[in-house]
Amino acid sequence: MPRIRKPPSRSLPEPSAALANTTTRNLWLHFARHGAGIQHPVIVRGDGVTIFDDRGKSYLDALSGLFVVQVGYGRAELAEAAARQAGTLGYFPLWGYATPPAIELAERLARYAPGDLNRVFFTSGGTEAVETAWKVAKQYFKLTGKPGKQKVISRSIAYHGTTQGALAITGLPLFKAPFEPLTPGGFRVPNTNFYRAPLHTDLKEFGRWAADRIAEAIEFEGPDTVAAVFLEPVQNAGGCIPAPPGYFERVREICDRYDVLLVSDEVICAFGRIGSMFACEDLGYVPDMITCAKGLTSGYSPLGAMIASDRLFEPFNDGETMFAHGYTFGGHPVSAAVGLANLDIFEREGLSDHVKRNSPALRATLEKLYDLPIVGDIRGEGYFFGIELVKDQATKQTFTDDERARLLGQVSAALFEAGLYCRTDDRGDPVVQVAPPLISGQPEFDTIETILRSVLTDTGRKYLHL
């Protein structure tokens, strides 16, 4: 497979205390702790699968930035696409007007999407796409004579975004508590973490059980009050939790029975992360809506989308009804142009097929870590895996909250110091997440495993008293 073209060489800045101090003084980072003595790394450059900090140190990016940089860093053609579009039409809104890049990208996404999902509403990112999907569901049912259908069901520990609506769908109490009262109408069902499933030994049977909890929740809330079910193909929070065989087939049956919309939240999973352009195709189901972002542009410019079926669009297509919703930068022409160029790379280099061919090798390489006592479970799909850390492999005993916080903080720092950028996830039992750029292959897999092995071996000695 062709490798990426290396960008023109540039000298890295000298270590700068002033730069780090400015970061501390002015920049309010996302999901980060701030305070005396806390310094955050400054990343200045990327090349292929490698990132560089302001001191010249390199790191293998095993998280694709934040599940974003599918095609790797330093893609000159994406920068060139942005520059060309900025020089032609740097901005125009989609508020009753269209632009050529938005038209073309919408057509492209409709071609990739399954079934009759042909209507594309652009946003600036993933959370906005989730907000859009919920609002579409609410208005759709009002327009079709079922105004009471407003609630949404999602899974325990699932993350769907941080704005007030998306946060109501998110299943993480710690993220929700500071911002209560939230938008009402979000309800939770169990997720599909088979490793932590009580009293289940058969994977398919467990999948049926988990899906049936959705039917149970719809019945409990009242079928005439539930508008949609939001599910990720592989659940991010909690550590790359895959769906058991038959799970989504059963969920589709349940949604059809109760006239509830199925939203496939693919903000992470779309665009090759699991394999196909849309992960619902890998798992064999057709949703009513797809939410996506991240890999759509490989992060070279912000963009998200909600893709809806023709059936959902129909009541909005009467010449009178308006979907009174939009974003200033949704479908920005520069971002849309970058998205088109990014998808050109996908097709030219066969990245989806590359992931499908190499995912078994990534899984097998990570599964070598099972010989470490601290590794309890390794799960995921495509180029999206989680490694759950435990006190005891045999009993699956996990760590206390205090232990988990110290453990993951130390593991994250040690991995980064060793030259590996990935993620430690404490939104559930402790997990290390691995999601490398889609151009990665066995050499990168081996480096990831080697560094993980070294750090987790040391961590096991400290926390398991070996």
UniProtKB/Swiss-Prot annotation:
Coiled coil: none annotated. Was identified as a novel immunogenic protein with the potential to reduce the severity of M.bovis infection when used alone as a subunit vaccine. GO terms for biological process: biotin biosynthetic process. Its EC number is 2.6.1.-. The modification N6-(pyridoxal phosphate)lysine is found at residue 294. InterPro entries: Aminotrans_3, Aminotrans_3_PPA_site, PyrdxlP-dep_Trfase, PyrdxlP-dep_Trfase_major, PyrdxlP-dep_Trfase_small. Its cofactor is pyridoxal 5'-phosphate. Keywords: Aminotransferase, Pyridoxal phosphate, Transferase. GO terms for molecular function: adenosylmethionine-8-amino-7-oxononanoate transaminase activity; pyridoxal phosphate binding. It is an enzyme of class 2 (transferase). It comes from the Bacteria. Transmembrane segments: none annotated. Probable aminotransferase. Belongs to the class-III pyridoxal-phosphate-dependent aminotransferase family. This is Probable aminotransferase Rv3329.
